[in-house]
């Protein structure tokens, strides 16, 4: 992160702490603005990194049978409250043209898309769209199950509640494929 931007974040954190009545000079808070700026550089790195473009394909005998990577752990920040939400992403696709994506690319794509302020619904759609646009597929299915700190810590205060979102494209819009995906991620 640029020094100027880091300084802006540090000043903003100091202002917030002062506004809520904290003594920003007490021992436990002196370096907090620096720590928060460093943390934001990490958790929002998807905003400053180049667009994810590592869609390495391999030849495969698989022609149209589901490839599923499930339980991809992730965290992101809710764009409404700047509080974390975290959970698991399940991504499946139906290969086309005898090509499959390198398996490590799916968790890397999820991480890249999640490292920015967003909402779970948009994150789900973004992952599906990026895959649909960049690899030859007959369909994509993405499911995310997450706990939102904006629901746990504030507002309705519902600890351990989970939110599930889904996005289906191509053949996964057909009930047979959709059902198979949903059964596999249970």
Swiss-Prot record:
Gene Ontology molecular-function annotations: GTP binding; GTP cyclohydrolase I activity; zinc ion binding
Domain of life: Bacteria
Pathway stated in the Swiss-Prot or TrEMBL entry: Cofactor biosynthesis; 7,8-dihydroneopterin triphosphate biosynthesis; 7,8-dihydroneopterin triphosphate from GTP: step 1/1
InterPro entries attached to this UniProt entry: GTP-CH-I_C/QueF, GTP-CH-I_N, GTP_CycHdrlase_I, GTP_CycHdrlase_I_CS, GTP_CycHdrlase_I_dom
Annotated binding of Zn(2+), by residue: 78, 81, 150
Catalytic activity: GTP + H2O = 7,8-dihydroneopterin 3'-triphosphate + formate + H(+)
GO process terms (BP): one-carbon metabolic process; tetrahydrobiopterin biosynthetic process; tetrahydrofolate biosynthetic process
Keywords: GTP-binding, Hydrolase, Metal-binding, Nucleotide-binding, One-carbon metabolism, Zinc
Disulfide bonds: none
Any Gene Ontology CC annotation: cytoplasm
Entry keyword annotation includes Zinc-finger: no
EC numbers: 3.5.4.16
Xref: HAMAP family: FolE (MF_00223)
Description of how the protein assembles with itself and partners: Toroid-shaped homodecamer, composed of two pentamers of five dimers.
NCBIfam families the UniProt entry points to: folE, PRK09347.1-2, PRK09347.1-3
Sequence similarity: Belongs to the GTP cyclohydrolase I family.
Designated name of the protein: GTP cyclohydrolase 1
Organism: Enterococcus faecalis (strain ATCC 700802 / V583)
